[in-house]
From Swiss-Prot:
Signal peptide stretch: 1-56
CDD domains (UniProt xref): IlGF
B, as annotated region: 57-83
Propeptide: 124-217
Name by which UniProt lists this protein: Insulin-like growth factor 2.S
Disulfide bonds: C64-C103, C76-C116, C102-C107
GO cellular component: extracellular region; extracellular space
GO terms for MF: growth factor activity; hormone activity; insulin-like growth factor receptor binding; integrin binding; protein serine/threonine kinase activator activity
Alphabetized Pfam families for the sequence: IGF2_C, Insulin
Organism: Xenopus laevis
Keywords linked to the UniProt accession: Developmental protein, Differentiation, Disulfide bond, Growth factor, Neurogenesis, Secreted, Signal
Segments for region (C): 84-96
Ranges for region D: 118-123
Gene encoding the protein: igf2.S
């Protein structure tokens, strides 16, 4: 009996030891898993941040076609823009146009502004221009010019006479004729409206004439 009780005690001790080992292994696995999860989440966030920053500040941003034209119009505004810049220093080396740069390399705001057209002379510069740039016209020149324009207009009118006849009566003349016809119709209607309803006869009736004749006799 004592041997059996010892065996039971030993088996129970071994079971307790196994339970203790299992609980210890679980307790050690939990913090390890939590640390791994934290590291994994941190690595994912860092990767997303680097990708976003690379997209925001990447140097390979390109613009082509209609997008390039729209952005140039937006940046330059009323000044206008050129597709290529010409520097007067050296004409041997041709400059690349904005299409070659922005479509195949990279494009930014500073580069776009270099292709904007420079504003021309101001109004003050135009007003201070010498008056001898446009010589004044004399009266004789004006007369000749006016006479020439008149004769040329007359020639054109003569040339177009055939076309005018083919076209028929002009619209203005047709409108005038229509207006005259309408006026005549209105006058006729007014005359009819002012006419009396009953007209008195000029001659006497026959009965009255016969009655008046014996009285005279």
């Amino acid at each position: 009996m004592e041997q059996l009780s010892c065996k039971h005690r030993s088996s129970s001790v071994e079971a307790e030891a196994q339970l203790c080992r299992q609980t210890e292994s679980r307790s050690t696995q939990l913090p390890r898993m939590s640390v791994m999860r934290h590291l994994f989440l941190l690595s994912i966030t860092f990767l997303v941040y680097t990708l976003d920053s690379a997209k925001a500040y990447r140097a390979t941003e390109t613009l082509c076609g209609g997008e390039l034209v729209d952005t140039l119009q937006f940046v330059c505004g009323d000044r206008g823009f050129y597709f290529s810049t010409n520097n007067g220093r050296s004409n041997r080396r041709p400059n690349r146009g904005i299409v070659d740069v922005c479509c195949f390399k990279s494009c930014d705001l500073e580069l776009l502004e270099t292709y904007c057209a420079k504003p021309t002379k101001n109004e003050r510069d135009v007003s201070t221009a010498p008056a001898t740039a446009i010589p004044p016209l004399s009266k004789q020149d004006l007369y000749h010019k006016h006479h020439h324009t008149k004769s040329s207009k007359y020639d054109i009118w003569q040339r177009k006479s055939i076309h005018r006849l083919r076209r028929g009566v002009p619209a203005i003349v047709r409108a005038r004729q229509y207006r005259l016809l309408m006026e005549k119709a209105e006058e006729a209607e007014q005359a009819l409206s002012h006419r009396p309803l009953t007209t008195l006869p000029i001659t006497r009736p026959l009965r009255l004439q016969q009655a008046s004749e014996p009285s005279h006799n």
